[in-house]
């Protein structure tokens, strides 16, 4: 299968975002989270505006505690930290094993965090659609160009 960066994930967060935002004042940290969380919706707006069909689907993301109790402890601690930042269940919500089982069957799971701030797209269709959109704006694209420096 494809890696995350090539598999069509359009995430409204960054790995380690809490560390990246930690040095900011609280209101700026919250603004940073809001900016990140808005990424999938902003992309959807551009897709609509430019008429790009790339199989966009905003279904959210699950961070699962699938195998070990320690995974559940880590996820719950992460969720606690997110709530301490002022985020709430509309951003990140704990799913019990029974709730998780309604979406994804993982035998013996310990639960999961669900965030709605994620979508999937078909990357090649997105790239082709964006290329057509910027060409309409007068941008010249050069494919298969040799890099000299």
In which residue ranges do the predicted regions lie?
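Extracytoplasmic/periplasmic beta-strand context in beta-sandwich domains
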Residues: 8, 60-62, 145
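Residues at the C-termini of beta-strands that transition into short coil/loop
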Residues: 14, 96, 145
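Glycine-rich active-site loop/strand segments that organize a redox cofactor
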Residues: 5-35
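A conserved beta-strand/loop element that lines the FAD pocket in flavoprotein oxidoreductases
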Residues: 134-149
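Active-site cofactor/substrate anionic-group-binding motifs, chiefly glycine-
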Residues: 1-2
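Rossmann-like flavin
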Residues: 23-133
């Amino acid at each position: 299968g494809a890696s995350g960066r090539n598999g069509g994930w359009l995430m409204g967060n960054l790995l380690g975002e809490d560390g990246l935002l930690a040095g900011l004042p609280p209101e700026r940290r919250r603004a940073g989270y809001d900016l990140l969380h808005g990424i999938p919706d902003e992309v959807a707006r551009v897709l609509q505006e430019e008429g790009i069909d790339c199989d966009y689907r905003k279904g959210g993301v699950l961070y699962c505690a699938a195998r070990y109790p320690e995974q559940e402890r880590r996820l719950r601690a992460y969720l606690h930290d997110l709530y301490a930042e002022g985020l709430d269940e509309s951003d990140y919500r704990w799913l019990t094993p029974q709730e998780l089982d309604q979406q994804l069957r993982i035998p013996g799971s310990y639960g999961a965090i669900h965030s709605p701030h994620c979508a999937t797209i078909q990357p090649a269709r997105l790239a082709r659609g964006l290329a057509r959109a910027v060409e309409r704006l007068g941008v010249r694209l050069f494919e298969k160009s040799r890099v000299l420096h």
